[in-house]
Amino acid sequence: MRALITGVAGFVGKYLANHLTEQNVEVFGTSRNNEAKLPNVEMISLDIMDSQRVKKVISDIKPDYIFHLAAKSSVKDSWLNKKGTFSTNVFGTLHVLDAVRDSNLDCRILTIGSSEEYGMILPEESPVSEENQLRPMSPYGVSKASVGMLARQYVKAYGMDIIHTRTFNHIGPGQSLGFVTQDFAKQIVDIEMEKQEPIIKVGNLEAVRDFTDVRDIVQAYWLLSQYGKTGDVYNVCSGIGTRIQDVLDLLLAMANVKIDTELNPLQLRPSEVPTLIGSNKRLKDSTGWKPRIPLEKSLFEILQSYRQA
């Protein structure tokens, strides 16, 4: 059994590669970084925007599964690079779908979307199901909603085997800065090491998000590749909402020093979804998946990853 992970050198890709290896899957991974190396992964240098190269890589490997992770993943950065976000996320996906179609492969594809596709959720719609109306409120959200629509179109028009996820906030050791848990943890450790004044700069702390550990996320991706229904969309989420303020409080309680907070207007986004909590009923019913790693454990391990760096 062969699996291709695009964007394998990214945060989720590394965890997914490790999980697939544990399932005795032969793993191939693409990365823009020629130097990237992962254990038990055959690495391939690839720019997802090079459609001809994408086609050659896929036709050469002939994977049974493709996990399409290569993407621009920052909501915040999407406001600064709207064109780049849309191009990479939408046209990169098109290149993968067309490569599989043109190669006439019998291959299951997982396209990775986001809770940001839902955007403005009304109070009575929470926790949000896959049937909910999409009202994305960021360029990133629009790009991922477009990916989901393309996936559905290729299933209907060409009979391709595609599943689309709407993945909510995922966290864990190794995620890049620019995501809230990492930014908080890095500042706390810098303060502990006296590299920073004992003040954490924060954005909107009232937003409510649905957090899941990345190790639970990749298990969901694997189970969906095995048991998901072609053409369906699946929320990948814990089903539990947590205020950003509460995430910060949990991290501050783990700090070795007293720390104050200060609002940084630069960390506020032009428009922000106030509450995003998902229903994972479809995922659970289809695969038997359930999250195993509690938020507190994820946050502690993120802190420890910076302390040990």
From Swiss-Prot:
Residues binding NADP(+), per UniProt: F11, V12, R32, D47, I48, A71, K72, S73, Y140
Keyword presence, Membrane: no
Bridged cysteine pairs (disulfide): none
One Pfam family of this chain: GDP_Man_Dehyd
Gene3D superfamilies: NAD(P)-binding Rossmann-like Domain (3.40.50.720), UDP-galactose 4-epimerase, domain 1 (3.90.25.10)
SUPFAM superfamilies, per the entry: NAD(P)-binding Rossmann-fold domains
Molecular function terms from GO: GDP-4-dehydro-6-deoxy-D-mannose reductase activity; oxidoreductase activity
Catalysis performed (reactions): GDP-alpha-D-rhamnose + NAD(+) = GDP-4-dehydro-alpha-D-rhamnose + NADH + H(+); GDP-alpha-D-rhamnose + NADP(+) = GDP-4-dehydro-alpha-D-rhamnose + NADPH + H(+)
Keywords: NAD, NADP, Oxidoreductase
Binding site for substrate: S114, S115, N169, D183, R209, R269, P270, S271, E272
InterPro entries listed in its UniProt record: NAD(P)-bd_dom (IPR016040), NAD(P)-bd_dom_sf (IPR036291)
E.C. designation(s): 1.1.1.281
Keyword NADP among UniProt keywords: yes
Similarity-based family: Belongs to the NAD(P)-dependent epimerase/dehydratase family. GDP-6-deoxy-D-mannose reductase subfamily.
Function: Reductase that catalyzes the conversion of GDP-6-deoxy-D-mannose to GDP-4-dehydro-6-deoxy-D-mannose (GDP-D-rhamnose).
Protein name from the UniProt record: GDP-6-deoxy-D-mannose reductase
Native source organism of the sequence: Aneurinibacillus thermoaerophilus
Lineage: Bacteria, Bacillati, Bacillota, Bacilli, Bacillales
